[in-house]
Amino acid sequence: MVGYFTLPMSETLIRDAYFLKQIDEEEPATDSASAATAIATGQKTDAGNIAWLTGDPADGALTTIAETLRSDQGFSIGVVSTVPFSHATPAAFVSHNVNRNNYFEIANEIINTTQPDVVIGGGHPDTYGRFRYLSESDYNALNSGDAGYTFVEWTAGVDGGDALLTAAETIDVTAGEKLFGLFGGEGGNFDFHQASDTPGNPSVTPGSVENPTLTEATNATLSVLNQDPDGFFLSRRLTWMT
């Protein structure tokens, strides 16, 4: 897609994708919501749409690859992101909405309807200072266990990576158990890491102990999803932390 105008993938030759020109002065390129939707569903759509048909019809929800693999093949599914879990890219694989900024609606669908087997991402209200990326009621449901997840969250002074990996070891995905990790720093995202200027001896200093690294979050997710003999699907996103 370029701008707000779409072409069905089935009608667009692969080679043509390299010659498409900007056709909307206000939208020189697609946004991450429609880009992720194209990857997750094989369907091009309007900028800002999360797995939803162009034009925003009432019945426009698009089935994602994660949903198809779960329903047709029995796969377990997970999303890992260094930005808030209800942001466009992770959300496009496990939710549906006409507006990427409807964070509460998107988070509610992920937590209560799609219910991926593993969700790890940013958006914790304590680190952001308010409820922006999920509602207080959904946060409380996660915290109390009512949402059906083993919940690991950003906690001052606690090593988030260790806590996440420890929790993952207790999950039996074949028994329907699920893991949710909610972290974040400034802006709701995981912390930036500081790379050392030491040629020949590379190292990275994490921004905080409370947030897991992407490696830790991924390893925790894989330790859960890999239990499924039918297979698994994982969407993994790295942004704004390196």
Region spans (language model):
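Long hydrophobic segments that form regular secondary structure
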Residues: V209-D230
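N-terminal catalytic scaffold of extracellular/periplasmic and nuclease hydrolases
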Residues: M1-K178, G184-E186, F190, G207-P212
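Active-site His/acidic residue clusters
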Residues: H87-V94, G187-V204, Q227-G231, S235-T242
